[in-house]
Amino acid sequence: MKKTLFSVMWLAIAGVFTITALSACSDDDNENKSGSYVIQKNGVVEPSQQVDMGVFNIDGKKYRLIFAKTNLTARGLAKAESDFGDFFSWAAPEPWCTAYERTATSLTPTAWISGKADGYTLANAQYYDGTRYTKYQNENEQLLPEDDAAHNLLGGDWQIPSRAVWQALVDANNKSVTWGKDGEMKLTFIDATGKPGMKISSKSNPENYIFLPATGRIIEKEFLSVGLHGCYLSSTLATPYNIWAVGFGEGSGGVFTACRRMTGCAIRPVRLVAE
């Protein structure tokens, strides 16, 4: 059988990224889906969109980590590996930004869901009542399935990776996987779009890899470090106000607690298969 685990982090790097045109936040090809939290189900994700990264020790047990090939969007998975997908706040059921403008040096949000026009703020944060968070208050507490956007959108046992999952993937660098060429954690390009990111490859089967675009993150209405830094949610709470997340930049990466619950970050779904 399979067991559910979760986690979160980020790494601050300032910078700009040269891109052009108007874009929707979601580049996706799947319809909105939801379903019961059923173990041993692939949900709505096709086999071609799943990547077997090998077996890892997660909290003392061995699991095969099956990652989605692309980032999560409001309606499923992004079309291309280099697509940013959508930016989710922790425990939120949907992204608040629905479109952004790409300029020569930045991304600028241009559309929001109803009630979230102020952006990724504390006041808008899921389960914040104006004075405190009313749900999830304990260190290392995990998101429940009903608050996991990856599970709710993809179904099956898909989930946001836990802190333990991300940490296992980081610790495996130059052992069972490589982060960037030769494990040096250098950013690279995966296609002609010119969007940089981190390529994490299985050492035993280099054709099995995931590419994490350097999405940056969004705080309030400002995108930060786009093209220089990747910030991906975990399902694990660090403090009542902060979460664990995985972050990377040119030559560095790890799991950190500097990500606030209301920050908008990318999600790379995973499912765990017990060995």
Regions flagged by a language model, labelled:
Residues 1-12:
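Bacterial N-terminal signal peptides that target proteins for export
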Residues 2, 32-63:
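Structural boundary micro-motifs
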Residues 20-24:
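C-terminal motif of bacterial Sec signal peptides marking the signal peptidase cleavage site
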Residues 27-41, 55, 69-79, 83-94, ...:
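C-terminal, surface-exposed recognition/capping segments
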Residues 49-133:
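A short glycine-rich, aromatic-capped structural motif
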